[in-house]
Amino acid sequence: MSPSQQQTSVFNALGSYADRIKDANGNFIKSSPSSSSSATPEPTSLSSSTSGKKAFSTATSKSGQQKQGSSPQPGAITAEDDGPWETVQSTRARQRTDRSEEKEKRGSSSKNWRERSHRDEKNQDDGEKRNGRERSKKEKGDKSNSAPFVGSATSSEKTAKSLSSSTKNAWGVTSSSQGENPIASNPGPKQKAQNDSTFRSSSAAAPVGPTTSTINEIIKQSEGSDEDNWRARPAKVEKNEKTEGPVSITQAQPQPQRQLAPPPSVNIWDLRKKMSVPVLVSPTSATSAVAGIPPKSDKEKSLTNGMVKEEDSGTGKSLSKKKSAAAAAAAGTSSTPPSIHDATLWPDIIQAAEVVKAGEDKKEKAKERLNSESASVAEESTIGIGKKPKWTPIPAHELLAAADHAAEQSRRQNRMEAKKRSSGREGGESGPTGSGAPGKSNKTRKGMPAAEGKKARKEGAQQKDGHASSKAGETIGAGTGKANGDVKETKEGDARSASQQESSSHRSGPSISASANTGIDSSLHARTKSTPNASTTPLPPHTFNLASSSNLPRSTRGRGEGRGSFGGGRARGGFRSSGALGHKGQLGHGYGHVHGQGQGFGYGYGSPPMGVAGLPVEGIIYAPLNPGAGAGAGASPNLYQRGYGMGFQPFYPAATAAASAGEGGPTGAAAGDAAGVYDPAAAVYGNMGMYKSASMPPPPMPQTVVPNLDPLRFYVLGQVEYYFSMQNLAMDFFLRQQMDSEGWIDIAMIASFNRIKSLTPETSIVRECMILSNYLEVREDKVRLSGAESHRWVLPDAAPSKFGPDPRSPSLAEGAESSEERDGAASGSQSGLVTAGEEGAQGLQASPRRMFGAQDVKDALMKSSALSTVNGEIKEKEEVKAMENEGEESENYEQ
């Protein structure tokens, strides 16, 4: 391939970058579609040329003319002031330009702001990169073709120096003149402008014999422009290594190696040391000489070395060393800084460690003091300063036993005080009641710590002499303290302590004479204006000793039975009434002499005096009188512990009572102790297996007294009678909806209630118990309230009854009284009462029928005790008021 063909092909390859040529300022040259070159060549000589730019401009103009004449291009040729130029067609470049212009109009889709802001620079760098590669190819081709025409090294070096200040070339353009005509040395102003602006313009390069000077100028010009283009440097190094001749070796001469800088004539560190030492030492020397304190420089060094100790805590020896060293430094003995090997300048590690250890010890002591304070406060009260004490679970039976002991002791004290008052009122003399021990126990129980309670419990279990009564209060305190402490006692210990307390109380308590019993009995009957009735159903034929009676539940503290009468019964739940019992006798007979038992500790029970609706009368003192039992007037045993039925008088089933309290048999706590579990209900109901669960309260006590009744029928009877009680019917609308027009209810409906089914699933047993009741009337498979009460609770829209009116029914015989009762007359309740003789003659029932009026229901629901009718008799207002005053006085005294 000839040099001209190579140059032509190279130019054609590089022609697409013609519109990316930059001027001296780095701006793109806006070339028109048809660019022209000078038409008239002005030959100049290389020797007379003053600048490489002019020579190159002339050469390119001549080559443009030669290309125009020899090989014309299809592009249009236009003539301008500088001459004809050939238009280079570049579709690829135009497409790229159009695409870039559209991109500029739209904006870049890139999210990088750097790409958007440097869009033009990126395009320029791409053009320069391509131009550098093409220029290196062109230069290699030119050197291989122009080897025979290489000029002298001297002229080449001069030309390179003249071209070193030229602008950048987009590529190395090789151009030669058509002949060896000399180039004009003095070009016109138009030619100079052309040299400055189109120094990289595109022109066809197809000379046959290019001159040596022109080639060298172009090569050196491109080399000079490559110095500013970092992309062309690697190509330049390769070119210098492979080119021949001394010219390329001279041009590719590397720069001299960098040498280390000579050391400075002045050492800055020595100069700084000389300048800093007098400034720091000289002003402190005077002050240290006068005051004798260490200089500032020494203090700063000690702080930077990690000095942690305080100067006050240092020893005198270390301080003297520091002062001497500081004084020597202040006197100017040494101009250099003190040595690091001087031990006096470093902090005392041992002393610093002691200071740190002392601080830690102080913190630990503060923490211990705080913990001890919180522990002491936690012992005094259940809630500590910042955190709760650790909770220790306590078995339920221990809590129940402790609560029972505490309640029993307080009740015993109240009974003793009431007994003393009642004896004083009646003129009877009683010995020392021994209330000092309960008083002491009550005072001890309130502020008893857990540790003392535990000790007291052990002593109480060991002692069996007369001093056991004084230990009873401490035992109660221990039971109370177990809820907050960690005391864990066995059940046997609880039972033994309880039995010892009871026995000691029995020994210490005096007995009441029979005359005192008779006097109290007569006074109570006189006060209520009622007489004993011989037809009263006898009590169960068994006796109770003190151990079993002490575990009996008692009434609430400070009030009699009548206060919580209708306190909380909810529909068919536990009966909370303290209503009267079914028999006619208002007070029990034969306290200790039932069935001819003249002596002994028979724990007989009576019923309270009944009001118009079977309500107990406030202020009337009624209580079991048991010699030596410590139970006085004003309180009666409460079978329903912890709020289960507040105040039924205890009539025990014969079988259960005989089994639990027979001769020589275990009773009360002893029975529970033998079983290994303390069961307060064992002393009340006997061995009742079905009520071991705490979730099932015992059923209400029956108001009808039936002797020798087995436990099952005893409980069923009490539950059934509660369903038909005034307290339940006043709230149980569902049960009233089951009544027909005559008040009859299906027995199967009653037997389907959950409490009845928990006792027995047999409907026949339920019917049998209903027949035993004094307040219910049974016919076939129906049951209703007896007497006129059957119509009181019937709803207006009740279904018609399948039974017609019974001529023998008391409701027909007492129709007038029933109508008066429906109208709410006050005398209605009295008119419904019949004597016991009439009942015996008729053989109907052994107990009076309850005749409820509208006012009775209201009084029962509102817990009203100010009734004008007492025991079926209309009292005068003065008498009622006097009775109320007496009741209030006794209650206040008990509280």
Curated annotation (Swiss-Prot):
Highest taxon in the source lineage: Eukaryota
Disruption phenotype: Sensitive to various stresses including heat, sodium dodecyl sulfate and calcineurin inhibitor tacrolimus. Resistant to tunicamycin-induced ER stress. Simultaneous disruption of CRZ1 enhances thermosensitivity and decreases virulence in a mouse intranasal inhalation model for pulmonary infection.
Extent of Basic and acidic residues compositional bias: 95-143, 228-244, 296-314, 359-371, 405-428, 452-468, 485-495, 873-884
PROSITE patterns in alphabetical order: HTH_LA
Keyword Magnesium: no
This protein's GO CC annotations: cytoplasmic stress granule; cytosol
Residue segments, region Disordered: 24-265, 285-344, 359-590, 796-857, 870-895
HTH La-type RNA-binding domain location: 706-796
Biased composition (Polar residues): 172-184, 192-216, 510-521
Positions of modified residues (Phosphoserine): S847
Record's keyword terms, sorted: Phosphoprotein, RNA-binding
Amino acid composition bias (Low complexity), ranges on this chain: 31-75, 152-170, 251-260, 325-336, 496-508
Start-end of Gly residues biased regions: 563-572
Transmembrane intervals: none
Composition bias type Acidic residues, residue spans: 885-895
Short name of one Pfam family: La
BP terms from Gene Ontology: positive regulation of translation
Keyword Disulfide bond: no
PANTHER family hit by this protein: LA-RELATED PROTEIN 1, LUPUS LA PROTEIN-RELATED
Biological role: May act as an RNA-binding protein.
Record-given protein name: La RNA-binding domain-containing protein LHP1
